[in-house]
Curated annotation (Swiss-Prot):
Family: Belongs to the AccA family.
Xref: Gene3D superfamilies: 2-enoyl-CoA Hydratase, Chain A, domain 1
Native organism: Geobacter metallireducens (strain ATCC 53774 / DSM 7210 / GS-15)
Subcellular location: Cytoplasm
Descriptive protein name: Acetyl-coenzyme A carboxylase carboxyl transferase subunit alpha
Paired cysteines (S-S): none
Gene: accA
Superkingdom, taxonomy of origin: Bacteria
InterPro entries given in the database record: Acetyl_CoA_COase_a_su, ClpP/crotonase-like_dom_sf, COA_CT_C
EC number(s) from the headed UniProt entry: 2.1.3.15
Quaternary structure, from the entry: Acetyl-CoA carboxylase is a heterohexamer composed of biotin carboxyl carrier protein (AccB), biotin carboxylase (AccC) and two subunits each of ACCase subunit alpha (AccA) and ACCase subunit beta (AccD).
Keywords tagged on the record: ATP-binding, Cytoplasm, Fatty acid biosynthesis, Fatty acid metabolism, Lipid biosynthesis, Lipid metabolism, Nucleotide-binding, Transferase
GO biological process annotation, one example: fatty acid biosynthetic process
Catalytic function, reaction form: N(6)-carboxybiotinyl-L-lysyl-[protein] + acetyl-CoA = N(6)-biotinyl-L-lysyl-[protein] + malonyl-CoA
A molecular function GO annotation: carboxyl- or carbamoyltransferase activity
């Protein structure tokens, strides 16, 4: 699917694509024009390849936030079957910023949980812009505990700017809900695979991201704070997001080098927003492969491996 939403650095490509479309519309049976269209299409692919091979960290932030990137429900449609959504935390309410339920991956029952954003204004408000309240994290934990009870592997999709910072969320125990999830996920005895699909925003992301394997899509980001938030704190200037992005080391290659993640999942040329099906196919292969490896481990190996994985992240160099 070709997105109509343009990123600034993609404009030369979009302009050429418009010219190609105009040529194609008038080409008819004209062989010369058809040949020219084919040449220009190859040129577009080459331009996009060069652009995306040289993205700055700030440009990757923009791609990760692209409104047409696939969200959790899109992956559920393309990768899983027999999805049954489960609602509510049994304490306060149902948070629409987190979706989850039972599904099948290649015929095997799994529990799928993920952040869910919206695309139009109505849906964005309904999903609270992908920022969960405490009841969202408590719903996620309820489903994880259910998965453990029924011995179902857990797969989570992370894509959030962060946990919702509203007064109501704080009154209902936002910090406690996140902290409890971190503690409980670390001790679960079933395989957990985490996928960072877009924005991995601080504790709001980590609350469903303690896993045996952590995968990141090629142009996703994962950090302790947004670049704009970091810039506002360090330099009292939120417009210095590009500078902060460089300092945060928030891209998939950065985090693979630091051993924070286990694998970078290749995106289609131009990003996941351009081709949901190919992105889902690539991710499906990675999920199936990692799940097979994790199922071969004993419970003791799973829990100890997960513990050691997160313990070694606190390295620093002088």
């Amino acid at each position: 699917m070709a997105s109509q939403y343009q990123l600034e650095f993609e404009k030369p490509v979009f302009e050429l694509e418009q010219k190609i479309q105009e040529l194609a519309d008038i080409a008819g049976d004209n062989v010369e024009l058809k040949t020219e269209v084919v040449k220009l299409e190859k040129k577009v692919d080459k331009m996009r390849e060069v652009i995306f091979a040289n993205l700055s960290r700030w440009q990757m932030v923009q791609v990760a936030r692209h409104i047409d990137r696939p969200f959790t429900l899109d992956y559920l449609t393309h990768i899983f079957t027999d999805f049954v959504e489960l609602h509510g935390d049994r304490l306060f309410g149902d948070d629409h910023a987190i979706v989850g339920g039972m599904a099948k991956l290649d015929g095997e029952p799994v529990m799928v949980i993920g952040h869910q954003k919206g695309r139009d204004t109505k849906e964005k408000v309904y999903r609270n812009f992908g920022m969960p309240n405490p009841e969202g994290y408590r719903k996620a934990l309820r489903l994880m505990e259910m998965a453990e009870r029924f011995r179902m592997p857990i797969i989570t999709f992370v894509d959030t700017p962060g946990a919702y910072p509203g007064i109501g969320a704080e009154e209902r125990g936002q910090a406690e809900a996140i902290a409890r999830n971190l503690r409980e996920m670390a001790a679960l005895t079933v395989p957990i695979i985490v996928v960072i699909t877009g924005e991995g925003g601080s504790g709001g992301a980590l609350a469903i991201a303690v896993g045996d394997r952590v995968l990141m899509l090629e142009y996703s980001i994962y950090a302790v704070i947004s670049p704009e938030g970091c810039a506002a704190i360090l330099w009292s200037d939120g417009t210095k997001g590009a500078q902060a992005a460089e300092a945060l080391k928030l891209t998939a290659p950065d985090l693979k080098e630091l051993d924070v993640i286990d694998e970078i999942v290749k995106e289609p040329l131009g990003g996941a927003h351009r081709d949901h099906e190919t992105m889902a196919k690539n991710l499906h292969e990675a999920l199936a492969r990692h799940l097979k490896e994790l199922k071969a481990l004993s419970v003791e190996q799973l829990v100890e491996g997960r513990y050691q994985k997160f313990r070694k992240m606190s390295r620093f160099a002088e």
